[in-house]
Amino acid sequence: MMTHPLLPKLRQLKLSGMLNTLDLRAEQALKEHLAPIEFFTLLLDDELERRSQQRLANRLSQSGCHAQKSLAHFDYSAVPGINRTMINDFATCAFVNRHENILLCGPTGVGKSHLANGLAIEALKQDLRVFSRPVHRMLADLHAARASGGYPRALSRILNCDLLVLDDFGLQALSPSAIQDLYEIISERYEQGSIIVTSNRSFEEWHEVFCNELLASAALDRLTHHAHLLVITGESYRQRSRRKEAISKAQMPNSSS
């Protein structure tokens, strides 16, 4: 990096985006005969991009999403039944602005959680507030927060986010208090905030999760109103990977022969 009186000033102002690209932009300005205002605009754009990426990283960390499970990394060829055009439409996050829900059902390993996580990342990119947790963990955390006096704050994060992702709905049995908490969350967010739900259970089995027909009917009525239901079929990613690995090993030449 070149030595210039500007460098310590950029460091003092914490303009690391401009600092990191200053040499590159100075060289570009000379080669392309850029006007000073054009050169400065490029540096400002670099700083804005750096801050945008930092905000996204912070929101990812706070949201509970997994950075590596983005839509860009989703293997659509492995799940041919998925309507990619529909997923791309969801990725615009218009459904969040309309306070609509997305319900993803299907067997283990077909990409439900990956899709939900990928859509949540797209929401984060649009500066939307996201809270993502497996259902049983979210409810366990609420129970612990109630005991420690932090329940109002913990509940507020769930209720006030723009997009709530409830992963693995119905995977584990819930206590009566957890069921009540889940119902209240769904009820409070009705037409106020979007929810994405993933579940290994068929939609027809979702009533069983609540162990109370009245609560189940009320909760699912709110959850399914203004909702998009996607039933995903196919073979588990993990099973397919194990089969490919077994085939690959079987085709390897025997070194002892």
Regions found by a protein language model. Give the residues of each.
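Interdomain "pre-motor" coupling segment immediately N-terminal to P-loop NTPase/helicase cores
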Residues: 7, 11, 16-66
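A conserved P-loop NTPase coupling/switch region
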Residues: 1-5
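AAA+ P-loop ATPase motor domain of ring mechanoenzymes
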Residues: 41-94, 98, 236-248
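Conserved P-loop
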Residues: 82-160, 207-209
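Walker B motif beta-strand of ABC-family P-loop ATPases
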Residues: 163
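Alpha-helix C-capping/helix-to-loop hinge sites
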Residues: 9, 25-29, 77, 142-145, ...
